Amino acid sequence: MANRKRDAGREALEKKGWWRSHRWLVLRRLCQFFVLGMFLSGPWFGVWILHGNYSSSLLFDTVPLTDPLMTLQSLASGHLPATVALTGAVIITVLYALAGKRLFCSWVCPLNPITDLANWLRRRFDLNQSATIPRHIRYVLLVVILVGSALTGTLIWEWINPVSLMGRSLVMGFGSGALLILALFLFDLLVVEHGWCGHICPVGALYGVLGSKGVITVAATDRQKCNRCMDCFHVCPEPHVLRAPVLDEQSPVQVTSRDCMTCGRCVDVCSEDVFTITTRWSSGAKS
């Protein structure tokens, strides 16, 4: 029998203990705050580890790291980025293409804790009503951004990019940008379940495409143990990616959809240990 959304993870907590039912969540938060700390260590303490923001930065003033979407906008607008920016984009593209799926979204993005909080509150207070918008709208928005950059000759997304805006706000203070971040929080809380990360964000859409054939993946390796409690579906920001691996015995046990954020919450909340985080070659996934 399916559990209520507000009770998602309770069985796992009782059966596996706190650490094993929150392990991947804790590790993700540590990773997110570690990356954020590398950005903040310079302006706050004078120790520059990551110099810049989430769109473009230098690691130890040496290794460039550039958001691929910003680079694509620059190319589309007719402006060839500097060699250091192109190098940074290649590094990030190769890194996430090899690692897999949307690891940036769940392990690095500073907005993820905010949207996670909104959706935890949604479950906690039984806010089950949700507007319906197509998940592919993020890919449409991605194309619109690139076409818009080509037509205007500007990096149009960077004017409102909430990911880089969040990083800048933490360094320079929350001004009007706080209103956009608050709007995203309320959108996820009151309008569309997993609305930003699961439906709209073009940054996540691009990382999903880049990492679609990467190494790291989630697999329902012991799906025969599934008791249909639905806790994994309740907490997953992209629950449609779990249907085939969990419910269709003819499908590969691996989550092969590029929409998967590899956040590990399905692993945490499953009281039967159906899921593992593994490599794409270990369970016979379709390529």
From Swiss-Prot:
UniProt keyword annotation of Flavoprotein present: no
Protein name: Ferredoxin-type protein NapH
Task of the protein: Required for electron transfer from ubiquinol, via NapC, to the periplasmic nitrate reductase NapAB complex.
Disulfide bonds: none
GO cellular component terms attached to this protein's record: membrane; plasma membrane
Predominant location: membrane
Gene Ontology MF terms: 4 iron, 4 sulfur cluster binding; metal ion binding
Pfam families according to UniProt: Fer4_10, Fer4_5
Record topology, Periplasmic segments: 51-79, 161-170
Regions of this protein lying in the Cytoplasmic compartment: 1-29, 101-139, 192-287
Membrane topology of the entry: Multi-pass membrane protein
Cofactor (UniProt): [4Fe-4S] cluster
Localization terms from the record: Cell inner membrane
Alphabetized PANTHER family for the sequence: FERREDOXIN-TYPE PROTEIN NAPH
Binding site residues for [4Fe-4S] cluster 2: 260, 263, 266, 270
UniProt superkingdom: Bacteria
InterPro entries: 4Fe4S_Fe-S-bd, 4Fe4S_Fe_S_CS, Electron_Trans/Redox, NapH_MauN
UniProt keywords, alphabetically: 4Fe-4S, Cell inner membrane, Cell membrane, Electron transport, Iron, Iron-sulfur, Membrane, Metal-binding, Repeat, Transmembrane, Transmembrane helix, Transport
Organism: Escherichia coli (strain K12)
Assembly with partners or alone: Interacts with NapC.
